């Protein structure tokens, strides 16, 4: 089965009144509802779709773009709360679910929160506000003796997660925590924002200091102005 919570390139193998069936590459098929079908699609075409579970927990495909996919952090709005948990708008027909057991604090309709999307032990896509369960404090090699996956100056993707006295805690590449210090911030940013950034320093304790501009940017700008 095509893994739920991710984008896949799947081949159209059958057409029915209610939509197209796509080959899930493992001997099964997944439905793309008719209202989601791109114009002029035909059997044999390969379509880029996002696969998730419908209200009956059956795999279903969509051409809509969710606000996040599996193993990513996102800033989502709470649309409802019931006796089992909270529901978040992630851009698809079926809302993302946050069980009470993985809520750092109780969520309320109309509020927004940072969440991490993962598969629970039943195979459902769920969200958690307990980011520390998934985001690592320290970078580490995949295998002993190998270089660290990040080094000083590397370009990275940042998710601004929390304001602190020092600046902002940010999630780096959906995997590690890092600190963006006040002294390295030159324009307004906000919690929930996604930004391009850089590794300022991999510290001796394997934690990450971050910056929003490449190293040497401050020195280069005045020189560039003089040349112009």
Question: Where do the protein language model's features map onto the residues?
Answer:
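Single-stranded RNA-binding regions, centering on S1/OB-family and related RNA-binding modules
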Residues: 1-228
């Amino acid at each position: 089965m095509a893994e739920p919570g991710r984008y896949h390139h799947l081949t159209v193998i059958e057409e029915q009144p209610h939509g197209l069936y796509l080959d899930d590459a493992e001997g099964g098929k997944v439905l793309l509802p008719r209202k989601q079908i791109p114009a002029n699609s035909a059997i044999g075409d390969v379509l880029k779709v996002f696969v998730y579970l419908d209200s009956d927990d059956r795999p279903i495909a969509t051409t809509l773009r969710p606000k996040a996919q599996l193993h990513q952090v996102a800033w989502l709005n709470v649309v409802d709360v019931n006796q089992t948990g909270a529901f978040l708008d992630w851009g698809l027909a079926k809302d993302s679910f946050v069980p009470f057991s993985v809520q750092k604090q109780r969520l309320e309709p109309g509020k927004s929160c940072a969440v991490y999307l993962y598969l629970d032990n039943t195979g459902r896509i769920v969200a958690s506000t307990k980011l520390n369960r998934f985001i690592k404090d320290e970078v580490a090699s995949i295998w002993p003796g190998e270089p660290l996956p990040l080094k000083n100056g590397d370009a990275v993707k940042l998710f601004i997660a929390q304001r602190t006295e020092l600046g902002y805690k940010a999630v780096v590449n959906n995997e590690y925590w890092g600190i963006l210090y006040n002294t390295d911030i030159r324009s307004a940013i906000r919690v929930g924002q996604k930004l391009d950034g850089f590794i300022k320093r991999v510290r001796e304790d394997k934690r990450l200091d971050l910056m929003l501009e490449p190293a040497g940017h401050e020195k280069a700008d005045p020189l560039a102005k003089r040349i112009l």
